[in-house]
Amino acid sequence: MRILGLDVGSRTVGVSVSDPMGWTAQGVEIIRINEDEKEFGIDRLGEIIKEKNATGVVLGLPKNMNNSEGPRAEASRNYAKLIEKTFGLPTDFQDERLTTVEAERMLIEEANISRKKRKKVIDKIAAEFILQNYLDSKGKLTK
């Protein structure tokens, strides 16, 4: 049973996947999207769901530091509804506050990756953090 983790932005969706036991998360790829033109990368996401035999999807929920939700949180909730409707998979959310900051810090301090290269992988690593935090706190996602 594998779970996908998503970091949904307005231009990209970072994708990660759990191992079959649901213990660890690893980055998969970054899907290009365009919210303005209603292009949400659903075809590619469907391919990944099939390739990885995913049984559920966890999306990062970008909350403000005061725990309120803004427009990006609403966009994540809408993306989850689209996934449920299109693929019939259960979805859940994981607070993603500071995951991108944490991913950026790791890439700078531990991997010494240049800014240009960081931009190419940051969303995938943020998706990894989102999914790993979910697995550590909640475990398996089922219908």
From Swiss-Prot:
EC number: 3.1.-.-
Residue ranges that the Swiss-Prot or TrEMBL entry lists as coiled coil: none
Native organism: Leuconostoc mesenteroides subsp. mesenteroides (strain ATCC 8293 / DSM 20343 / BCRC 11652 / CCM 1803 / JCM 6124 / NCDO 523 / NBRC 100496 / NCIMB 8023 / NCTC 12954 / NRRL B-1118 / 37Y)
Highest taxon of source: Bacteria
Listed GO MF terms: nuclease activity
PANTHER family found in the cross-reference section: POLYNUCLEOTIDYL TRANSFERASE, RIBONUCLEASE H-LIKE SUPERFAMILY PROTEIN
SUPFAM superfamilies (alphabetical): Ribonuclease H-like
Gene Ontology biological process: rRNA 5'-end processing
Localization (cell): Cytoplasm
Protein function: Could be a nuclease involved in processing of the 5'-end of pre-16S rRNA.
Taxonomic lineage: Bacteria, Bacillati, Bacillota, Bacilli, Lactobacillales
Alphabetical list of InterPro entries matching this protein: RNaseH-like_sf, YqgF, YqgF/RNaseH-like_dom, YqgF/RNaseH-like_dom_sf
Signal peptide: none
Protein name: Putative pre-16S rRNA nuclease
Keywords: Cytoplasm, Hydrolase, Nuclease, Ribosome biogenesis
